[in-house]
Amino acid sequence: MKTSLQIAAEATPRPITQIAEELAIAEQFVEPYGRYRAKINLDLLDASHDRPRGKQILVTAMTPTPLGEGKTATTIGLGMALSRLGKRAICTLRQSSLGPVFGIKGGGSGGGYSQVIPLEDSLMHLTGDIHAVTQAHNQIAAMTDNSWYQKNRLGIDPEQIQIRRVLDVNDRFLRSITIGQGGSQHGIPRQTGFDITAASELMAILALVSGENHADVMRDLRQRIGRMVVAFTRQGQPITADDIQAAGAATVIMRNAIHPTLMQTIENTPVLMHGGPFANIAHGNASVVADQVGLRIADYVVTEAGFAMDMGGEKFFDIKCRAFDAKPAVVVLVATIRALKAHSGRWNIKPGRDLPTDLLQENPDAVYAGGANLQKHIRNAQLFGLPVVVALNSFPDDHPSEIEAVREIAMSAGAFDVAVSKVFSQGGVGGEELAEKVLAAIDQAGQAQFLYELEQPLTAKIATIATKIYGAAEVSYSEAASEQLAKLEANGFGNLPICMAKTHLSISHDPALKGAPTGYSFPIREVRASIGAGFIYPIAGDMMTMPGLSANPAAQQIDIDEHGNTVGLF
């Protein structure tokens, strides 16, 4: 089979103005960035206020291997399959961070015959939103340090400056640094570090702002940025971006980033790409405004939640769905036979290495042995009150006995149905079985619900997630984490939802624990607050907010030829 880049290069994208026209988006709301991408101005929300709302389909997954299990390709393929069945469908996806693109995991634009095109545009910069977030965030960070340096009228405690600088890169050398060296005219030395932009609170804000019209969204953006807690005083009082008078400038930098970007799939199904928060160190979903626009202009919005149901899936309901008045009608859970075998504990799949040859051999017993992971994710999804359709992402090495094992595992856990998805190799036609079963599930959909109430104490909400979703027996806190929780409660932030930062390679905090571990203690080592975004995020285990590069990063294979064509990109 051809590479994803070769397939993308042979595809024929249509002018983005035509894609917009077919969605009945008036020309005045389409702001092209070249021929094949365009910002959709949020004035469209005002103009489409009376349109009936579409239905939302949430795509998530079982716990992935480091290679990923094809969730984005499934999301795109399902959108294309719905279009083939005569439905007006649109996909909403996050914008890819350059960190994973040049790292090991790859981008978030799908692959094979189920991808967003033009591929390079979708992976490299798009319309500049991530750069706007980076600039705005670092502007606030610079003004925080400057406020402390310039007479410190707000009483900033330098040991409690919360905001760290960000870059859209994987770079472990920036995790812990000293700034302000070289004498007093260059600042005052202090320890800090960088996070990846996808972990920035401003990225989470961009993905969570909402409103009934353009003005509402802009107002919400300005207010959320103003509420960002950048530091504390020695007395424990929060200091915000408004306090240091940085919120206005940051909002101006991001004023164009609030508009979602319209792209298309390889079969010309429309895609809205907007927002890029990671799901392991942020809430991991495409923006609320992309969904709002999609629900106004399409009958079905297929959206993706990052990593697995315990990660982006849970956060989709308990964080994103609280930000606007819409909930999905069905959950699609992506599974692969290789991931099920990996969760048997018999193989150790590592990024950058070929799959063990014996893992590809027919072995339904290994599939059953890893089935607890898939079943746990199905039951987790059911906690939110919706039917679950399992999409088995098919690979050439899958065997009929293994496929039947997946069906038995899923149905015994209460899945609505199981569909074999071949969208990677066949495009939309390979997703028609999945689309038909999703539509059948929507006809019987229940009412989506939250996992916990916001009024519960922070520790109770954390315990609910850890025990009900992760299978832990208890939660343990470091001394620092306990103090941080107490300070947040004392400052009136106890009614915010929880955004757990943990590994995506296990339902637990420990990437070595496969399957569906139970009976363990879930450790919280640190608790941070994203008050502007509107959540508290505890950090479990050794979770890093700035990734590092592997020994053989993907960037080493990427180059350009004499005609300006990208080579080596997937």
From Swiss-Prot:
SUPFAM superfamilies: P-loop containing nucleoside triphosphate hydrolases (SSF52540)
Catalysed reactions listed for this entry: (6S)-5,6,7,8-tetrahydrofolate + formate + ATP = (6R)-10-formyltetrahydrofolate + ADP + phosphate
Any one GO molecular-function label of the UniProt entry: formate-tetrahydrofolate ligase activity
EC number per UniProt: 6.3.4.3
Keywords: ATP-binding, Ligase, Nucleotide-binding, One-carbon metabolism
Binding-site positions, ATP: 65-72
One annotated GO biological process: tetrahydrofolate interconversion
Signal peptide feature range: none
Any Pfam family matching the protein: FTHFS
Gene3D superfamilies attached to this UniProt entry: Domain 2, N(10)-formyltetrahydrofolate synthetase (3.30.1510.10), Formyltetrahydrofolate synthetase, domain 3 (3.10.410.10), P-loop containing nucleotide triphosphate hydrolases (3.40.50.300)
Domain of life: Bacteria
Pathway(s) annotated for this protein in UniProt: One-carbon metabolism; tetrahydrofolate interconversion
Cross-referenced HAMAP family: FTHFS
Family: Belongs to the formate--tetrahydrofolate ligase family.
Designated name of the protein: Formate--tetrahydrofolate ligase
Organism of derivation: Herpetosiphon aurantiacus (strain ATCC 23779 / DSM 785 / 114-95)
